[in-house]
Design a protein with these regions (language model features):
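Active-site-proximal beta-strand elements of phosphoester/diester hydrolases
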Residues: 1-5, 99-108
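Short acidic low-complexity segments
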Residues: 20-23, 88-97
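Short catalytic/ligand-binding loop motif for oxyanion handling, primarily in non-cytosolic enzymes
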Residues: 36-37, 67-69, 97-102, 110-113
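Active-site-proximal loop/helix segment associated with metal-binding centers of metalloenzymes
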Residues: 103-150
């Protein structure tokens, strides 16, 4: 499963009032769950439900986890953050469950220097369009982090 986007109120309400069908022992959430610097989202009742219904919950950060001025390198290149005993967010980790290796890593693009301006403009245009003309809260550093331009 991916793209829960718990940072959006409508999605959080839906998740709060609707349970997902349990379809296995391990739940993998492949990105875009909540902003990593959000102090409320990790306390969501969803994690209690997931912990009770799955043997293991493996969360991999996507690009949206690093929005809202969360520095991609703040935690380093390899880390894990346990929300519950069996619910964790993993970056550049391998978790072995029953002889199956789960390789948990955010994949970033390597944008050639000559294309940096095009990606920069595209991100700003898409964010402004999404916000319907409102001032976007994206700075130059965010653009470089999101698109892997260093």
């Amino acid at each position: 499963m991916s793209d829960l986007h718990m940072e959006f109120a409508e999605n959080s309400r839906y998740i709060k009032h609707n349970e997902f069908p349990v379809t296995g022992d391990v739940l993998v959430l492949a990105g875009d769950t909540f902003y990593l610097n959000n102090t409320v989202a990790p306390l969501s009742k969803f994690w209690k439900w997931a912990s009770a219904n799955y043997r293991q919950v493996l969360i991999v950060p996507g690009n949206h986890e690093y929005y809202q001025f969360c520095d991609v390198m703040e935690r380093g290149l390899q880390w894990k953050w346990m929300l519950k005993d069996n619910v964790g967010i993993y970056q550049n980790q391998v978790v072995c469950i029953d002889n199956t290796d789960f390789i948990l890593s955010t994949l970033w693009s390597n944008i050639p220097a000559q294309d940096e301006y095009w990606y920069y403009q595209s991100l700003h245009l898409s964010v402004r369009g999404f916000l319907k003309g409102a001032q976007a809260s994206v700075n130059d550093k965010d653009v470089r982090v999101l698109y892997g331009v260093w």
